[in-house]
Amino acid sequence: MAETRKKSLSVIYNGTEAWSELFPVMDRFTYTDSVDQSDTISFEISDRDQKWVKGWIPERGDIIEPCIKTENWNYEGERLTLLCGSFVVDDFSFSAAPLRGSINGVSAPVDSCFKETQNTKTWENATVQMIAGEFAAKYGLSLVFDADDIQVEKTEQSKQTDSDFLKQICEKYGLGYKVYAKRLVIWDYRRYFAQAPILTLSPDTVRSWKYHSTMQGTYTGVRVSYKNPKTKEMVDVLVGTEERLYKTNQKADNEAEAKLIGEGVLLKANRKASTMQITTPPYLSLTATRTVRISGFGRMDDVYFIESVKHSITRKAYDMQLQLSRISECSLKQG
């Protein structure tokens, strides 16, 4: 007789196991693993006995560490665990009747200044890794830097939060960043686009799908200028081709930086050129920043970058919703 598929959660709340208290009242748990935004979690509960609203009501700043577990899902004897990370409770609400609650958390440093306090500072003769390392140390995070380091002659943070400024620096050079499990992770999109697909999805392995392709807001090339240190003249560098040219006011310090800035502009814009939204059963190996092969969908077949994964778990069901971008549409075409 085939083993029954099983799903469960482990939840550590402020350092204490809490799943035994959450399980009887939980209606839905969602976990969104995203490239462009902080990861989030949400618990929807039915508080019929008023335990949460009277005695266990959460506080903003509480720490939740959930973990998803599955058994026998893809084959008998399979046991998988997905560590969702560490989340700060940033929002909760209760309503009646019936008495229901929602507890929401975001993956971010416990110190809210990272996303709330505006700062001004100038960096000179720095690197992206050096700047990221300073922020990681400031907020008690470990730094994971999965990219070639980039020299930054001079850059200014002007009345910006540390989070916004770091995102600006990363996007400028075609890098991504997120806070996950008390780590500040930075990666190079070019490097991650080149990864081998972690899994192949076909029509019989998905529950629903939608494909969308657009030219609006996408570009074939961009011009970035820099000043020649010898002649003092401005030099234009074309990245890509001229068919649909993006106009940017960003200036570079040299030719190499101009190319990186141009690539960053195109990588950010063209990730929305061709996209797929797919709902699947749980494949815990599929995480944001990985790649997946789409096969059996006709002309939509290709390798895609996973932009986000939303896990939705109820007592009866477990679905994953994938947001994908077509890597061949993001690739830089040279004239």
PLM segments and residue spans:
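C-terminal amphipathic alpha-helical segment
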Residues: L201-Q250, N254
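Amphipathic, non-transmembrane alpha-helical segments in extracytoplasmic/periplasmic proteins
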Residues: I41-E44, G105, T120-V144, Q157-Y180, ...
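Soluble periplasmic/extracytoplasmic beta-strand elements of cell-envelope proteins
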Residues: S42-E44, E65-C67, S86-D90, S102-V106, ...
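Short, compositionally biased
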Residues: E78-S95, K121, T155, R190-F193, ...
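Short beta-strand-centered interaction patches in the first periplasmic/extracellular domains
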Residues: A2, R100-I103, S107-D111, F145-K210
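Juxtamembrane "anchor/assembly" segments of surface/extracellular structural proteins
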Residues: M1-I63, A108-V110, V239-G335
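Surface-exposed cap/loop segments at beta↔alpha junctions
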Residues: W52-S142
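Conserved "cap/hinge" positions at secondary-structure junctions
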Residues: I68, D188, G296-G298
